[in-house]
From Swiss-Prot:
Record family assignment: Belongs to the Tom40 family.
Protein's GO biological process: monoatomic ion transport; protein import into mitochondrial matrix; protein targeting to mitochondrion
Entry function: Channel-forming protein essential for import of protein precursors into mitochondria.
UniProt source species: Drosophila melanogaster (Fruit fly)
Listed name of the protein: Mitochondrial import receptor subunit TOM40 homolog 2
Subcellular location: Mitochondrion outer membrane
Keywords: Ion transport, Membrane, Mitochondrion, Mitochondrion outer membrane, Porin, Protein transport, Transmembrane, Transmembrane beta strand, Transport
InterPro entries attached to this UniProt entry: Porin_dom_sf, Porin_Euk/Tom40, Tom40
GO cellular component assignments: mitochondrial outer membrane translocase complex; mitochondrion; pore complex
Subunit structure: Forms part of the preprotein translocase of the outer mitochondrial membrane (TOM complex). Interacts with mitochondrial targeting sequences.
Molecular function via GO: porin activity; protein transmembrane transporter activity
Main location: mitochondrion
Amino acid sequence: MGNVMASTADAESSRGRGHLSAGLRLPEAPQYSGGVPPQMVEALKAEAKKPELTNPGTLEELHSRCRDIQANTFEGAKIMVNKGLSNHFQVTHTINMNSAGPSGYRFGATYVGTKQYGPTEAFPVLLGEIDPMGNLNANVIHQLTSRLRCKFASQFQDSKLVGTQLTGDYRGRDYTLTLTMGNPGFFTSSGVFVCQYLQSVTKRLALGSEFAYHYGPNVPGRQVAVLSAVGRYAFGDTVWSCTLGPAGFHLSYYQKASDQLQIGVEVETNIRQQESTATVAYQIDLPKADLVFRGSLDSNWLISGVLEKRLQPLPFSLAISGRMNHQKNSFRLGCGLMIG
């Protein structure tokens, strides 16, 4: 009897100690799996979702959107014939008759090489034009690598070389560096050197600067340097561009309102001459009618317009140009026919 009671007491004591040990169980040590912490994984995913910066283009293209839709007027009668002699060579014949400038015949030639860098780009490109006075303008554009492009321009007057310019554009992943050297005179110690840099800060914002250095005996003080700041903000079909320097500033605004309408506003201010000009321009495209119209109005009350109409099914294009200056009470009209 005593043994039975003793064994029963021992069993109850064992169960009590079991419940106590279960209530005082120590926490298990965390096991390291060797993986990346979840916070770091989320941060890496958020970084991967950020849009990659792209090349912002060159500083020369900063205000091109607004400039391209402005009316490029001409005066008098003009006939232009474009003829392709091969897949790489094309010639242009132009006859211009007007009272404002030299009338006569112009000849142009274009050669496009076989080095393909894109569906619409091939290099080298050779351009040449001879005006009615016998002056020659020649340009060479070549893509040396996928990122480096060089341009060379020269001008001949009276069988003499009067102007040269060499430009190199290096397009990085998110920046563009441009170096330009104009009219270098190694014997006369004169010339112009320009350095331009444009950097994509965000997907919409690009900032940069331009440094221009001009030296020579005809320059006041024999040398002058100018530093300017540039910026561009683009979102959707809207682009704001600005150039700010000690001589003035240049501000432009461009918006593509629809597939048929583009609008641009431009303000140029020269602080030294205390002059400022504002221009409002627009372009209307009517693809079904094969018609394009560009018009502009500036603060000097100069109204300009150019109408271009393709005459289908013939390879002809008709251009009508008009320019009216209210301050000078003058009107200029031009009519042109382009074949080819």
